[in-house]
């Protein structure tokens, strides 16, 4: 299928590359189909673009929390497990959406720690896990030794 995007122009997307978020993402519930795009190169990509296939103007920068030194331990409800088609742990990718605070003139980018994306990499189905209270077990591993 050919998709027009504002970041990448016209892109051919094979159906097996589509990631479906049945409930959409918070604030963007109408967009349910996405593709992941990353810069080509010899190194592992540090971030990805999650491009909506339903809205060509909608794209998010996402990152593996491990790249930022975070390790999530998330408990999924029975409904979330069913939506993700009961994946085994090795088939799950947890990603964080990056955002820029509007009141920040420095243009700093922050990960959304309260609402990570959880994706079943085999079935290519995902959800946004919104945590009402911030109580995940997070391990920081990239701390500078000069602290």
Swiss-Prot record:
One of its GO terms (biological process) is bacterial-type flagellum assembly. InterPro entries: Flagellar_assembly_factor_FliW (IPR003775), Flagellar_assmbl_FliW_dom_sf (IPR024046). Its main location: cytoplasm. Pfam families: FliW. It is found in: Cytoplasm. The keyword Cytoplasm applies. One of its GO terms (cellular component) is cytoplasm. Keywords: Bacterial flagellum biogenesis, Chaperone, Cytoplasm, Translation regulation. It comes from the Bacteria. Interacts with translational regulator CsrA and flagellin(s). HAMAP family: FliW. PANTHER family: FLAGELLAR ASSEMBLY FACTOR FLIW. This is Flagellar assembly factor FliW. It comes from Dechloromonas aromatica (strain RCB). The gene is fliW.
